[in-house]
Amino acid sequence: MVVIRAFRRNDLDDLYRICLQTAAGGGATAYRDPKLVGHVYAAPYAVLSPRSVFVAEDSHGLGGYILGAPDTRTFEARLEVEWWPGLREIYRDPADTLRADWSSDQLLIYRIHHPHNTLSDIVERFPSHLHINLLPRLRGRGFGRRLMDRWLLTMQEMGSHGAHLAVGATNLSAIQFYRACGFQELDRPSPVSSDPVWFGITLSNRIRQH
């Protein structure tokens, strides 16, 4: 049986593990520092916005999660004060080296030192944002949809009127999933760009439809 439940503090190591195993570009084999991906895409949500984190757990342990922030601008500001400074002391900014030579680790470290904020027109319409990851054993069984439903309802209860996310343009299965959950495509990069595809959902419309 798979249980969808709220995050607990002792789940943090599992968030790091799942985040690494599901990372684009090779997952666990792509990074020398196994904590880096989680430092950017998982742990800050568990620490700074734990009410916005839910997990899927089966007899083997945690197999997936959804996490995010109800107010993206507030979260970005908190990262700059409460999260990035500590990591910047640990990881050296690679900006003074040739970008073409950067490793997967250095690409993430650069993001720690130079985070880019979400475009204002997206945040104004869809203030919340999310990340969702499932290990293969839980995919295709409806648990991603259950996590999404739980998270979106929680965001609405917290006062949000919309949520957004970004996904790689070549990740067709994820794009199909988000569309099935009610997200609408906001912006698609040119075919030669490495930029992500942005999706958004108006929460009042979605809840009314379900």
What is the predicted function of each stretch?
Residues 17-32, 44-45, 160:
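Helix-loop element at the rim of GNAT/NAT acetyltransferase active sites that forms part
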Residues 126-128, 155-168:
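Conserved GNAT acetyl-CoA-binding A-motif
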Residues 61-64, 173:
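Glycine-rich acetyl-CoA-binding "A-motif" of GNAT/NAT acetyltransferases
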Residues 3-17:
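A short beta-loop-alpha structural element at the N-terminal edge
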Residues 31-53, 59, 67, 115:
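Active-site rim helix/loop that mediates acceptor-substrate recognition in acyltransferases
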Residues 73, 164-167, 179-199:
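Conserved catalytic-core motifs of GNAT/GCN5-like acyltransferases
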Residues 73-131:
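Conserved acyl-donor/pantetheine-binding loop and adjacent beta-alpha core of acyl/acetyltransferases
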Residues 131-134, 140-157, 176-180:
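Conserved acetyl-CoA-binding loop-helix of GNAT-fold acetyltransferases
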